[in-house]
């Protein structure tokens, strides 16, 4: 007796090795309930090559015939010899281990997400009141959700995890996993701040996506909203706060008023000093030791000009030094306050 694997069934074949590929017929046992027995007919005299390889066991889904299940058999003789098997309905088999591979992966992912949701709700019970349900089909206008045959994730009203539960009424054909569009996979990957889009619709979807992660920092960013206009509003609010602060403090200036300038300085008409006798006259255009210059405008002082002498004995044009003292009460050369210098001398 030789065991031949046909799909998920192990069928015994009586006879020699050379006759194990002979066609046979089977019929379902009339009294079969949980176990399924099959009657094998007598072997036929048809001969096959002795090196005929056995079919490897493969997993098949309900609804497929036995001659279609092992898709990688190495000879066409077995396909011709086997008669089509009747469709078997395994309605008494339940549990996630018998589901298709893609559905089983979704079941495991659902378990992980539910555990993370439970831990987050236990540690932060007040967050459930701040969350609003979101419809995934409104997140991105260009995404066609009809292309996916997998169960669509639904956003929980009291949590932040995707609900990957499977409806019982769906047929097995709807569980085929198809590749997700590339622009949607970008948002399912690890979020990076410099990859966030700037348009409002994409930004809203990113905000909803990062809520799936249990990190408190990402949840805080999701609550903040990541609104593109938030940066401009923050700048506008900061500027308005500065204006309000200026109104409360008034005009803060470090300069002196005109009365203080007139009180602590000495304005007069400039009179140029003459050179002493016995010293040779210098050529016209050359500066002498007696020439004085205003260090603010860098112009030479001429006779009859209005000048102002500070308590530190530095001399400037009146117009130049008045504008300076209106902004700062310190001398432009020695940086001494005009009021402090006067008090020290007196």
Swiss-Prot record:
Its EC number is 2.3.2.27. One of its GO terms (cellular component) is nucleus. Transmembrane segments: none annotated. The keyword Zinc-finger applies. Gene3D superfamilies: Zinc/RING finger domain, C3HC4 (zinc finger) (3.30.40.10). GO terms for biological process: forelimb morphogenesis; innervation; motor neuron axon guidance; muscle structure development; positive regulation of BMP signaling pathway; protein catabolic process; protein polyubiquitination. Binds free ubiquitin non-covalently via its RING-type zinc finger. Ubiquitin-binding leads to enhance the E3 ubiquitin-protein ligase activity by stabilizing the ubiquitin-conjugating enzyme E2 (donor ubiquitin) in the 'closed' conformation and activating ubiquitin transfer. Residues 23-76, 267-288 are annotated as: Disordered. It is an enzyme of class 2 (transferase). The RING-type zinc finger mediates the E3 ubiquitin-protein ligase activity and binds directly to free ubiquitin. Non-covalent ubiquitin-binding stabilizes the ubiquitin-conjugating enzyme E2 (donor ubiquitin) in the 'closed' conformation and stimulates ubiquitin transfer. Belongs to the Arkadia family. E3 ubiquitin-protein ligase that acts as a regulator of motor axon elongation. Required for efficient motor axon extension in the dorsal forelimb by enhancing the transcriptional responses of the SMAD1/SMAD5/SMAD8 effectors, which are activated downstream of BMP. Acts by mediating ubiquitination and degradation of SMAD inhibitors such as SMAD6, SMAD7, SKI and SNON isoform of SKIL. This is E3 ubiquitin-protein ligase ARK2C. It comes from Homo sapiens.
């Amino acid at each position: 007796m030789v065991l031949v694997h046909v799909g998920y069934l192990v069928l015994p074949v009586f006879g020699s090795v050379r006759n194990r590929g002979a066609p046979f017929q089977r019929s379902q046992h009339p009294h079969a309930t949980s176990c399924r027995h099959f009657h094998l007919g007598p072997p036929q005299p048809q001969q096959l090559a002795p090196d005929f390889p056995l079919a490897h066991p493969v997993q098949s889904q309900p609804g497929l015939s036995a001659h279609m299940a092992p898709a990688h058999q190495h000879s066409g003789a077995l396909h011709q010899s086997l008669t089509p098997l009747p469709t078997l309905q395994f309605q008494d088999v339940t549990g996630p281990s018998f589901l298709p591979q893609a559905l089983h992966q979704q079941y495991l992912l659902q378990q992980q997400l539910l555990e993370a949701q439970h831990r987050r709700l236990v540690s932060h019970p007040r967050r459930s009141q701040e969350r609003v349900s979101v419809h995934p089909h409104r997140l991105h206008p260009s995404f066609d959700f009809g292309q996916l045959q997998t169960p669509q994730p639904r956003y929980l009203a009291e949590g932040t995890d995707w609900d990957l539960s499977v409806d019982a009424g769906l047929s097995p054909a709807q569980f085929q996993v198809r590749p997700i569009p590339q622009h949607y996979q970008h948002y399912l990957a690890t979020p990076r701040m410099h990859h966030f889009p700037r348009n409002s619709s994409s930004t809203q979807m990113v905000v909803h996506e990062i809520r799936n992660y249990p990190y408190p920092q990402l949840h805080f960013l999701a609550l903040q909203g990541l609104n593109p206009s938030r940066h401009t509003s923050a700048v506008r609010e900061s500027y308005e706060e500065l204006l309000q602060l200026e109104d409360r403090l008034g005009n803060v200036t470090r300069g002196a008023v005109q009365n203080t300038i007139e009180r602590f300085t000495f304005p007069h008409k400039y009179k140029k000093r003459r050179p002493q006798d016995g010293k040779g006259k210098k050529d016209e255009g050359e500066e002498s030791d007696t020439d004085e210059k205003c260090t603010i405008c860098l112009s030479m002082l001429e006779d009859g000009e209005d000048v102002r002498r500070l308590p530190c004995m530095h001399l400037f044009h009146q117009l130049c030094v008045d504008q300076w003292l209106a902004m700062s009460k310190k001398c432009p050369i020695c940086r001494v306050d005009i009021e402090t210098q006067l008090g020290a001398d007196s």
